[in-house]
Amino acid sequence: MCIRDSNYLVKLSVKERIYVAVNKKKFIEGIDRILSKNSYDRIVIWRSSFGWDVPLYQRPQHIFSNFAKQRTLVFYEVTRFTDDVKRIKKQADNLYLVNYANTAFSKLLFQELEKCKAPKYVQFYSTDWTLPAAKIKEYMQQGYKIVYEYIDDLNPHLAGTDELPVNVKEKYDLAMTDKNIFVVVTAEALKKDVIEKRGNVRLAFSSNGVDYAHFHDGCDPNFKCDEEFESILKKGQPVIGYYGALAKWFDYDLLKKIDQENKYQVVLFGIKY
């Protein structure tokens, strides 16, 4: 079975497995060319179903674009639902998009990574529900250091379920009990939770931010706002912009208080959950 559109289900393709096997030497040479470069000091494997080419350019793209600029070789997971990547694609220097669902190719990648002496890390989101804790333990046994990004309150609504997905809960429990795992938090409440469970060990605080250049440098100087937005600008008041999910955990009460002040204009950009 072989599907040829952008949702390339390569993991189901017998033809793809044969193609990788026949061209094994070529693929290994390509991977080795990447690993032989003197442009990095460490390697990060990003495992997540977030994807790269998604409507909201958010934390993962910001972080790993900058990691790549700071001598970190990144192999960033993309999904068959978001990115048309059969095997591997160079996104930027030191930044490669990888379809790990292509097990034939990813096996070759990890085979060559095993020979590499640079420090290696596996990094993933706390909210990721696709990667099981057993796989994380497998990475640890292979010598990878683990980075657990505790980015949000663990809420089943994020996954669209009534209960917290098993993979989310088990990875959280693993991160809270194994002090060899690095934990990155984005908020004080999450930091407090971690300290209560495992102390202030291998803990880093990294709040969400904005990649200013991403939003500014590509602006079209001739772009014209629609009439509704022009009317907001003409009011001459400070504009507060929000960019992110419009979900039940959003503080709508705070929004109402700001509106009552009648001093600001608020513009919301995001996907409604």
Where are these regions (language model features)?
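Carbohydrate-associated surface elements
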Residues: A189, S206-G209, G218
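Short N-terminal targeting/anchoring amphipathic segment
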Residues: I45-R47, V98-N99, Q111-T130, V147
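Membrane-proximal helix-turn-helix segments that form the acceptor-binding/catalytic region
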Residues: I63, D153-L154, D162-V183
